[in-house]
Amino acid sequence: EGTMTTSSFTVMTPAKLPISVGTPLDGPSKTVISDLINAHGFVVFRDYGMSTAQDFHGFIEAFNLPNFTYTESFSNAVRHNRTSRVFTANEAPPEVEIFLHHEMAQTLTFPGQLFFFCEKPAEKGGATPICRSDLALLALTALRPEFVSKLRALGVRYRNSMPIDADVASGQGRSWKDTLNVSNAEQAEARLTELGYSFRWLNDGGLSVQTPALMAIDEFGRGKDVFFNQIVAAAASWDNADDDP
């Protein structure tokens, strides 16, 4: 029960939408994709002959979208760049569970579109679950209307700890130097102050940070509100190493 089949959404194939490496999609084709995403939340592209990160890079290039790089992001995950547009999802070991989340919703900047590609299928499991956040918001509003009203009014502040060196055993082990794109503590403090974060240094050289209040619900110009935050992931799996309450 609840499992989506291919009849539940649109699967795009080369027969329906030809995409050639090096050839940008025309306006009408991009409108078709945008309309499908607005209706379903995602689109599945199948049989486009991708087998490598470079193939995937070329596929993405056809959409002519701005490149949101891992380096400039505040992503908590340890990731490796494969091309200028493609990076790994997370370097944590398979036994680390990655809970449902909204990509980088705990930061001031986040991507507007995401593409996923499986280069090597998992030996067991490995599927990427997708949840319609507009429908999740409707369900939550019906169950907890006061909570939703509070989210709308106040937003959410996030606190997490960043280690001094990358911890690949953690789903959120990116170091503060890499996350903030700095080389020393003075630069880190200046960067966080500029962005409105509060922070404190930990005894092991790590850094505990707290964001300013960020939106928890938004409509992103699409005409329908969505539940956009990291409340589920933070409650289920975030490990804050400092001793703040």
Cite the ranges covered by each PLM segment.
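Non-heme Fe(II) oxygenase catalytic core, chiefly the N-lobe of the double-stranded beta-helix
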Residues: 2-245
